[in-house]
Amino acid sequence: MDWQGQKLVEQLMQILLVISGVVAVVVGYTTESFRTMMLIYAGGVVLTTLVTVPNWPFYNLHPLKWLDPSEAEKHPKPEVVSVASKKKFSKK
């Protein structure tokens, strides 16, 4: 799953859960049934899971383009600069 696919999954998850929650509350309130409300919401959670958890092909529309090893060797890695540790002195 590419990074744009991850963004899409996050948006779909939020939208589907909110819609299923609102529908569940409205139907549960109108039918005066807590059980119906919970079943509708559970169905929404299952549907959201089936849509967002598997790595569906439409989540891979923008694959990452990695550098070839020969190209990566041309660009050196950044050097790590060690920073002297600073001790915090407490006031007494």
Swiss-Prot record:
Disulfide bonds: none annotated. Residues 73-92 are annotated as: Disordered. Belongs to the SPCS1 family. Component of the signal peptidase complex (SPC) composed of a catalytic subunit SEC11 and three accessory subunits SPCS1, SPCS2 and SPCS3. The complex induces a local thinning of the ER membrane which is used to measure the length of the signal peptide (SP) h-region of protein substrates. This ensures the selectivity of the complex towards h-regions shorter than 18-20 amino acids. The keyword Transmembrane applies. It is found in: Endoplasmic reticulum membrane. It comes from Arabidopsis thaliana (Mouse-ear cress). It comes from the Eukaryota. It is a multi-pass membrane protein. This is Signal peptidase complex subunit 1.
